[in-house]
Amino acid sequence: MGRSTAYRPALTLDRPGLYDWDADDAAAAEADPSAWHVEPKLDGMWGQLICDGATGEVWSQHGRYKATLDLPRPAGGRSVLHGEWLAGSHWAHRAGLDQTLHLFDVTVLDGVDVSGRTVEERRRLLVEAVAALGLDTHPQVHIVPRWSGAESAELWRTLVIEQGYEGLVYKRAGGRWGEGWARRKRVHTLDYVCVGINEGGGKHAGQGARSIQAGLYQPDGTLEHIGNVSGLTTELRRDMYARPDHYIGRVFEARGRGVYQRGTLRHPAFVRWRKDKPAKECVKPA
């Protein structure tokens, strides 16, 4: 049974800010393995499992209700467990993980705030809480695995490159909730043909382009509009709106966090124009 959208739980803590890392940062963590824990970053949304009584409710970071899970064993007091909720993404469907919750932390346990305890102690408490609630055998609940920083490069290769995980999360050993957290995400780039523009709305209506209509050549030789790419500078927005014909037909590069089967990028953003590449070479990726 769904919750009324007017209802909001008393969520415990805001989602921590994560530093964005690159390959050099990850290599530094691997060189000092005892200082870091590494966890996989799944293609889901931040979720909080709020357990009270015989049920646990999954809520997003913005206070939106997502699901209710029956607890095999009732909670002794209010507990808040944190994880990623996978629902509706291509990756979740392919992996057979749609509508599942992947837990990685706990901040409230039986009514007691444990956010100030070390990352290692909270991990132990999380495992114990999942077992105590009977969620260790629940088909929708999983605990995110964790490794030392020494495994960073191998995890990037096997999980991110080969299995399509979104990236890796790094947590400093001995840290409290959100202290010294970082992430490294995989970035994909693709080249498209500009087949049109989308006008800005609101205060930008009549003043600039909101996004570029991206096209790819199909096997039958037709150029098909397959998605839209944002991330334009103010100057480019205005110029594309003023003289769209100057841009239509040109090749551009975009980046995103993943590639869908159709050839569209996840969270696409404009990178640059490609004067060196013919439009006919912009084809749907294999």
Where are these regions (language model features)?
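Intrinsically disordered terminal and processing segments
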Residues: 280-286
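Covalent nucleotidyltransferase
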Residues: 29-135
